[in-house]
């Protein structure tokens, strides 16, 4: 009988399988990042993978809407797979308005986007992130950036850089240049400032109606500068915003330092729900974009009708794993129990049970392999100890224990072996 064709045996395009050594690496990173979030007082949350399409599409922007996995269920309801966790969490909070504020939540979960798969980018992927809901203070912005920095450091991204901006600064700048009507096209162009040639970035603006001289001026202004200089830059554009930024930078300096933080006017983020401070994180030898976030003070009002300040960030887990070189974690089996004789099976089960109670992993040979094949098998899967139990050992009440790392073998009474394990 013929099996499935090759394309059906592979994952669906944009998806991936996680083999044990890959999944243990994922779990290791999950544990590290969860500890960081919980050390800041954040609590883990989960939401359904499936949401009403209207909830997802309400403030995402057309580009993201086009990437939603959309379908109708058997009742005819328009549904979609979540593309991030910020929108579902905003919905949850809108349905639970009596929750004490500020809310500090974090997540480590799967999200879905139907975009073009690339190296290190999938249509089904994991995100780790946090949401801080209920505070408009610049201390809240500083806390979230601080938590992002600590998360990157904990993951091993010691050379990370976080670039920050504020959409309100860009909006005020455009107002002063008489370009407020072109905000959307300017945002689209700025987002490509370091991803595309100058002519392409300027061309996006001019084709959208921005005068060529203004487009060139905006391109020149959309550069990087130290955060301390950014305070003066923002103050010249708007005094009130300058005051906010001065406090924000002061709190950042106290919390995380400014060495790895930089102001970049081209950082605007692709989601339409951002309203204030925005930022992106880069890590690894090639400075991969591994995450980002910002403030979304209007999003919850769309769902609850109540104005609620909020901000957060999300890290693309697979991208971060690539940036820090975390691709595989081996988890050896502790004990493999090989029995020569059927009469030893009950004793082998007893030994395995006692080892498991002590927190070890233990496997009893199923009877399909001879000792030579079993030995080759345990080496291939990664095993610390091979325990041998035959008729002679059973009569003497002992086991042979072979340490596969030290290449040593000892014989021990069964009870002594279990006590000393």
UniProtKB/Swiss-Prot annotation:
GO terms for biological process: histidyl-tRNA aminoacylation; L-histidine biosynthetic process. One of its GO terms (cellular component) is cytoplasm. It is an enzyme of class 6 (ligase). Keywords: Aminoacyl-tRNA synthetase, ATP-binding, Cytoplasm, Ligase, Nucleotide-binding, Protein biosynthesis. InterPro entries: aa-tRNA-synth_II (IPR006195), aa-tRNA-synth_II/BPL/LPL (IPR045864), Anticodon-bd (IPR004154), Anticodon-bd_dom_sf (IPR036621), His-tRNA-ligase (IPR015807), HisRS-like_core (IPR041715), HisRS/HisZ (IPR004516), HisZ (IPR004517). Transmembrane segments: none annotated. It catalyses: tRNA(His) + L-histidine + ATP = L-histidyl-tRNA(His) + AMP + diphosphate + H(+). The keyword Membrane does not apply. It is found in: Cytoplasm. SUPFAM superfamilies: Class II aaRS ABD-related (SSF52954), Class II aaRS and biotin synthetases (SSF55681). It comes from the Archaea. The keyword Transmembrane helix does not apply. One of its GO terms (molecular function) is histidine-tRNA ligase activity. Its EC number is 6.1.1.21. CDD domains: HisRS-like_core. PANTHER family: HISTIDINE--TRNA LIGASE, MITOCHONDRIAL-RELATED (PTHR43707:SF1), HISTIDYL-TRNA SYNTHETASE (PTHR43707). Belongs to the class-II aminoacyl-tRNA synthetase family. This is Histidine--tRNA ligase. It comes from Pyrobaculum calidifontis (strain DSM 21063 / JCM 11548 / VA1). The gene is hisS.
